[in-house]
Amino acid sequence: MAIWQGRSLKKPSGGRIILARKKRKRELGREPANTKVGEDREKRKIIRTYGGNRKVRLVEALYANVFEGGKGKKVKILNVVENPANRQYARRNIITKGAIIETEIGKAIVTSRPGQDGVVNAVLIKEENA
């Protein structure tokens, strides 16, 4: 079933709202990309958006562009440590903006939106040894 992002057809009282027009294609939404940590390769999907433009969705991520002090480095993603968007996402290795990922050079926090941008950008987290 399609995801419709138009106005609700119910009033606050529970009564029906009768629309003066049909539903429009531009009001349709999509399922979330749910970018996972890939096993052997990266997988992207190109989708058509409003106005005939294109959006690149990252379905499986293998590498992340990790930045530290203005320098960037392409490193391999090992797994998802924590995800504040949904605690189940960490178990399922789903990457979203704000997720903490384990990389080859340490933990990093994701700053990009992989399902919207098609790339994983992250900033290295300073580890404090106590």
Swiss-Prot record:
Protein family: Belongs to the eukaryotic ribosomal protein eS8 family.
Gene3D superfamilies: 2.40.10.310
GO MF annotation, one: structural constituent of ribosome
Keyword Ribosomal protein attributed: yes
Any Gene Ontology biological process: maturation of SSU-rRNA from tricistronic rRNA transcript (SSU-rRNA, 5.8S rRNA, LSU-rRNA)
InterPro entries per UniProt: Ribosomal_eS8, Ribosomal_eS8_CS, Ribosomal_protein_eS8_arc, Ribosomal_Se8/biogenesis_NSA2
Protein name per UniProt: Small ribosomal subunit protein eS8
Subunit structure: Part of the 30S ribosomal subunit.
PANTHER family documented for this protein: 40S RIBOSOMAL PROTEIN S8 (PTHR10394)
Alphabetical keyword list: Ribonucleoprotein, Ribosomal protein
Species of the source: Thermococcus kodakarensis (strain ATCC BAA-918 / JCM 12380 / KOD1)
Listed GO CC annotations: cytosolic small ribosomal subunit
Pfam families for this protein: Ribosomal_S8e
